[in-house]
Amino acid sequence: MNNPIKLLISGADMGGLIASCALRHDFHESSRQEDRFQIYRIEKDTLTMEDVDACDLSGIRYAVNATLHDNEASFTFDEKCKEQGITVIHAVNLGKAAFLAVEKPKGYPFSEVVKKGTDDFLCSLGKYISQYGMFWQMPVPWIDEAIRHYSNESFPQLGIGAYIAAGYCANILANLAEGKEVKYFPKFYLSPLLEEI
């Protein structure tokens, strides 16, 4: 492939898994899958405003935010990308599950998940998932249980959730690169390890 798609991934551990999956995804028409994306990395789970200011977005087509979303800089990174017309994919490890949201440059802001209050990001996200499920009459009982269980402590960051997120993210990137349809935020992808059918 002559012109690889430039991809920026922020996030250390999960960011590395996403980069690996994106480079080795089955792209059917590409004999050399490594040529599909040219990947740039910010290998930090917690961004600073200095990281965001120093971030060069020249030619970047897609960005993945796999940080912990634990401060304002993470959302400032999203806004900087969106101002440059870059689609942002949010990958979140929920322990034994993964949450992914694709944010259009001029779409509904992902930062709306975090409402003003005392909840940390993952609890706010859990409440968003729960309310979304209730609204569409598709309850997510395991997320309600997790919110109750982890209301006073952090969600566990298990390897299982990171691998699920990385695989889903690679599929979303492939679909975007091939011009296929994806769900845009406020819709999202949610994949628990075990789901009742």
Feature roles, as predicted:
Residues 3, 13, 175-197:
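Phosphate-binding loop/pocket of nucleotide- and phosphate-handling active sites
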Residues 7-9:
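Hydrophobic Val/Ile/Leu positions in short beta-strands of Rossmann-like dinucleotide-binding domains
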Residues 16-17:
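N-terminal Rossmann-fold NAD(P) dinucleotide-binding loop
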Residues 20, 24, 28:
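Gly/Ala-rich phosphate-binding loop of Rossmann-like dinucleotide-binding domains
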Residues 28-40:
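Glycine-rich phosphate-binding loop and adjoining beta1-alpha1-beta2 segment
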Residues 50-58:
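Short amphipathic alpha-helix with an adjacent loop that forms part of the alpha/beta core around
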Residues 61-160:
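E1/E1-like adenylate-forming module used to activate ubiquitin-like modifiers
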Residues 107, 165-182:
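Oxidoreductase and adenylate-handling cofactor-binding alpha/beta cores
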